[in-house]
A protein has these predicted regions:
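Conserved alpha/beta-domain cores
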Residues: 1-132, 138-140
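Glycine-centered loop/turn positions within well-structured domains
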Residues: 135, 145
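Expand to "…catalyze enediolate/carbanion chemistry for C-C bond making/breaking, isomerization
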Residues: 138, 151-156
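Active-site-proximal glycine-rich helix-loop-beta segment
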Residues: 141, 148
């Protein structure tokens, strides 16, 4: 991807999924967007690397609205403080929020909560919704959706 990125600068690459702190130095030169900021430790690492690389990716804070133990993300009760710390102390370019609602529940209440949280923080971008629920996500102002299965089919 690094070679292609240089040849096609108009392409913007998005990092989705868990970003490990030890991979940040490799991810920063490659990805224009990071959809999964989920901890202070990761925020610190991105801050250090963006200074070294002189590049600030556009970042979404991942929120664990379903309070699921198997998923990463900031608890909504800590979101405002986390956001302020990321912007003011770590100088991160936070542009939005991201969530993955519980798979076995109606996603609409979670999408509505994301819309409200984003409005409170005055963030314009919301990354939520996948092939099975993107239409619901769009009703609640999602600006980035993931529809790989709709385009390419289910994984085998």
């Amino acid at each position: 991807w690094a070679l292609l990125k240089n040849d096609f600068p108009q392409l913007k690459l998005h990092m989705i999924g868990k970003l490990q702190t030890n991979k940040v130095k490799f991810a920063l030169p490659l990805f224009d967007y990071i959809h999964s900021l989920d901890s202070i430790k990761l925020a610190e690492k991105i801050s250090v690397e963006q200074e070294k690389k002189n590049f600030k990716p556009k970042i979404f804070i991942q929120i664990n609205l379903g309070k699921e133990s198997q998923k990463s993300g900031i608890d909504e009760d800590n979101l405002a403080n986390f956001y302020q710390k990321c912007v003011n102390e770590y100088k991160l370019n936070i542009i939005g929020t991201m969530c993955l609602p519980p798979f076995d529940e109606d996603p609409s209440p979670f999408f509505k909560k994301m819309q409200n949280l984003s409005e409170i923080l005055k963030l314009k971008e919301i990354s939520m919704g996948m092939s099975n629920d993107y239409l619901d996500a769009l009703k609640f102002k999602a600006t980035f959706i993931r529809v790989g299965s709709k385009i390419f089919g289910n994984r085998s």
